[in-house]
Amino acid sequence: MKRLEIYFDSFYTEKMKEELREYGIDQYFIVPVVHSSWSKTFKHFNTHVWPGTDSILVTYLEDRHAQEIIRIIKIMKIDLGRGISMCAFILPFEDIIL
């Protein structure tokens, strides 16, 4: 089992949920508003100087789904370009009680 965390521009929340639905993933958690500092010149603090916010999506996947979802996120990141905040990582996970 794997824990997948995706950090992304909040504008793309519906797109993220849509991608998960396509793979039959209906259990996930979203932290809707996160203030992020991606670099010295790229931040989302929801202010007039640093507009926008990010979100975090967390889900737990069977091993066979994890790499496919990461592949899709890589494609999305390439399509969106460097100016859009997005990163993802997979962590091994022993068990979960939902």
Residue ranges with predicted function:
Residues 1-98:
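Positively charged, small/polar-rich N-terminal and surface patches that mediate targeting and assembly
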